[in-house]
């Protein structure tokens, strides 16, 4: 399936107020600073405002609780949302009942996402884009303390995001699979290559 629904993701217009919502990957500011730089250098007569609503360590249930004051109160015309890395847990993947614990965390995440989805649907004057989160790298040889099957759990969350975007007519961009493909290619040359430092 197509990981990028470009036709449903309109470019930013002059005066657009864009809020990027997410976890530490958003909080770090890298990907949306590139978006801002692209628009600033190519469309200097169409200024936009980019606002970072990423908070490190957060999951969908945390994001749900701060939608009003951290997202909607900023009067955005455009909102992107990503989550999944923290939602899926970490050391649970080392436990004997990892599969069961993982399913519980995925369900908790998706339950919160359904609430977020309802709130976003009620805000009909803004463009919404869901971002399938970046991967957890299980194939790097950088270290041996890997959380096996963590990216599979992230992919289940991304699948729900993709379906919601399609159902609601929202944009969807998948960071996960393109980054996995690049990692696998680079690891053929250097087994310790990774984008993921968790």
Please describe what each predicted stretch is.
Residues 9-15:
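Glycine-rich phosphate/diphosphate-binding loops that line cofactor/substrate pockets in enzymes
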Residues 12, 33-49, 58-198:
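Alpha-helical cap/lid subdomain in secreted, periplasmic
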Residues 16-30, 56-59:
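Catalytic nucleophile-elbow at a beta strand-turn-alpha helix junction centered on a G-D-S/GDSL motif
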Residues 1-8:
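Bacterial Sec-dependent N-terminal signal peptides
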Residues 20-21, 52, 130:
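A structural signal for the hydrophobic beta-strands that form the central parallel beta-sheet
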């Amino acid at each position: 399936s197509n990981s990028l629904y470009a036709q449903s993701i309109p470019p930013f217009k002059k005066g657009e107020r864009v809020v990027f919502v997410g976890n530490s990957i958003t909080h770090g500011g890298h990907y949306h600073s590139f978006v801002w730089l692209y628009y600033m250098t190519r469309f200097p007569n169409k200024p936009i405002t980019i606002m970072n609503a990423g908070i490190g360590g957060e999951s969908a249930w945390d994001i749900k609780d701060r939608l009003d004051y951290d997202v909607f109160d900023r009067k955005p015309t455009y909102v992107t949302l990503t989550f999944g890395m923290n939602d899926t847990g970490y050391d649970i993947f080392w436990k004997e009942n990892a599969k069961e614990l993982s399913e519980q965390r995925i369900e908790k995440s998706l339950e919160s996402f359904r609430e977020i989805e309802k709130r976003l649907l009620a805000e009909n004057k803004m463009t919404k884009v869901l971002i399938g989160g970046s991967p957890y790298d299980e194939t790097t040889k950088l270290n041996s303390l890997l959380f096996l099957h963590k990216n599979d759990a992230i992919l289940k969350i991304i699948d729900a995001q993709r379906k919601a975007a399609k159902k609601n007519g929202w944009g969807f961009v998948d960071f996960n699979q393109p980054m996995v493909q690049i990692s696998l290619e680079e690891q053929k040359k250097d087994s310790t290559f990774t984008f993921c430092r968790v």
